[in-house]
From Swiss-Prot:
Stated role: Catalyzes the oxidation of glucose 6-phosphate to 6-phosphogluconolactone.
Protein name: Glucose-6-phosphate 1-dehydrogenase
Source organism of this protein record: Synechococcus elongatus (strain ATCC 33912 / PCC 7942 / FACHB-805)
Statement: the UniProt record of this protein carries the keyword Protein transport: no
Binding-site positions, NADP(+): 63, 168
Length: 511
């Protein structure tokens, strides 16, 4: 098979996308899983597709005393195991010439002086013109320290040439998020800060804005007059996966709801932006989150449910309870499941509930946004399968099988006027003949191009934390620990989560 880099783009009809300027990508925490499993495989894939400058240079930073050659071999294994493979040895060799390693401690000022000098030398060697992207793929407690040290060493001084990428979580509550934002904004401008949430790199998430605002048939229906409610689901089949140290201090509310689910929510509920520029879109996301609240502040049990998985069965094998996982507290009350009901106080959404849920050890891995429309005001037809007609449902599938489906009623064959529900289905891989790209691919290119559209702004982070703050304050209180519910691994949710939506006369979608 001909490697992508060696193909003639004119012959295969490719449009050449804008390529970032030559630059150095400095990855802090480069020996971690994210770099080997996600970042570098995505970068190499883009290298094959000619979407990155040939001068692109990657410098890995970590405490381990690795050589450049060892680092290159480590990343090669990642591309082979987690990416699309090397494809052509000469292509990999060219790419690997731009991979370097810089051992050092994140809190050592002298290391940053050494790093600055080495980057300057690489500018001369590789022709990267002083352009820098610093990617903080480290434990959250090191975000502030790394930013301070980079600022003190003068490596963030040029807003036109330097960028700082921060992985989630952005704080662990409103107060810590404000502190982190203050530190970041003290050493560089907001225009240099890229708070990355990989969900925003997924095709269906990006397509949500196009779907809403480029199709005249949907946006006029996108309001309280036609929509009954919205369900947003992020279900995972995995357990802790060796992350007990982090997860014990986070839980599902901090790990998933405040970032991933709130991002999906804001894109679904936002008003049309005045432009497709970064701030045009982000301004509207902030506005809708600021107008959002829990359904009942006085009685939080009517707004949200937390759960933790017990021992159960997944794919025919027994799996342990959360408390029995390696590294977990045997008496832990950390939630692995959250369901919540949000309301938006504006004209478009007044009275329309948004139900959000996420959990670990669910029966299947699925992420979707389901828009359920109101039923017809007068029923003239009889359903062939049930007493009432099913409502129309528009589903945006984020993963797996990214795509969009619309459920509607049709007449069954024969002389009767009975109806049944059918789905009109669109899938990216079928329609475009190839699977969607890795989420990090789009985000990394956008960052290098200086496009902040798919990255979270400081005020949006703080607005999201404000929405969930009442739950954090209650659930973090040891006196409220007994309020957690339990569900068996391999099942969808605790009974209390069913009650949360059933008391409104609705039910969770079957997935």
């Amino acid at each position: 098979m001909t490697p992508k880099l060696l193909e003639n783009p004119l012959r295969i009809g490719l449009r050449q996308d804008k390529v970032p300027e030559p630059q150095i990508l400095v990855i802090f925490g480069a020996t971690g899983d994210l770099t080997q499993r996600k970042l570098v495989p995505a970068i190499y894939e883009m290298h094959l597709e000619r979407r990155l400058p040939p001068e692109l240079t990657i410098v890995g930073v970590a405490r381990r005393d690795w050589s450049d050659d060892y680092f290159r071999e480590h990343l090669r294994q990642g591309v082979e195991q987690f990416g699309g493979g090397i494809q052509a040895e000469e292509v990999w060799n060219t790419f690997a010439q731009g991979l370097f390693f810089a051992p050092g401690n994140i809190d050592d000022p002298q290391f940053y002086q050494t790093l600055r000098d080495r980057l300057a030398n690489l500018d001369e060697l590789r022709g990267t013109r002083g352009n820098r992207t610093f990617y903080l793929s480290v434990a959250p407690r090191f975000f502030g320290e790394a930013a301070k040290q980079l600022g003190a060493a003068g490596m963030l001084a040029d807003p036109a040439k330097t960028r700082l990428v921060v992985e989630k979580p952005f704080g662990r509550d409103l107060s810590s998020a404000q502190v982190l934002n203050a530190i970041l904004q003290n050493v560089c401008r907001e225009s240099q800060i890229y708070r990355i949430d990989h969900y925003l790199g997924k095709e269906t998430v990006q397509n949500l804005l196009v779907f809403r605002f480029a199709n005249a048939i949907f946006e006029p229906l996108w309001n309280r007059q036609y929509i009954d409610h919205v369900q947003i689901t992020v279900a995972e089949t995995v357990g802790l996966e060796g992350r007990a140290g982090y997860y014990e201090t986070a839980g599902a509310l901090r790990d998933m709801v405040q970032n991933h689910l709130m991002q999906l929510f804001s894109l679904t509920a936002m008003e049309p932006p005045n432009s497709l520029g970064a701030d045009g879109i982000r301004n509207e996301k902030v506005k809708v989150v600021q107008a959002t609240r829990l359904a009942d502040i006085d009685d939080l049990s009517l707004s949200a449910v937390r759960g933790q998985y017990k021992a159960g069965w997944m794919n025919g094998r027994s799996v342990p309870a959360y408390r029995d996982e390696e590294g977990a507290d045997p008496q832990s009350f950390t939630p692995t499941y959250v369901a919540m009901k949000l309301l938006v106080d504006n004209w478009r959404w007044q009275g329309v509930p948004f139900y959000l849920r996420t959990g670990k050890r669910m029966p299947k891995k699925v992420t979707e946004i389901a828009i359920q429309f109101k039923t017809v005001p007068h029923l003239m037809f009889q359903s062939a399968t049930q007493k009432v007609n099913s409502p129309n449902v528009l589903v945006l599938r984020i993963q797996p099988n990214e795509g969009v489906s619309l459920r509607f009623e049709v007449k069954t064959p024969g002389s009767s006027q009975r109806t049944r529900s059918v789905d009109m289905d669109f899938r990216y891989d079928t329609a475009f003949g190839s699977p969607t790209q890795e989420a990090y691919s789009r985000l990394l290119v956008d960052c290098m191009l200086g496009d902040q559209t798919l990255f979270t702004r400081a005020d949006e982070v703080e607005a999201s934390w404000r929405v969930v703050t009442p739950l954090l304050e209650s659930w973090d209180d040891p006196r409220q620990a007994a309020g957690i519910s339990f569900y068996e691994a391999g099942t969808w949710e605790p009974a209390e989560a069913e009650q949360l939506i059933n008391r409104d006369g609705r039910r969770w979608r079957r997935l």
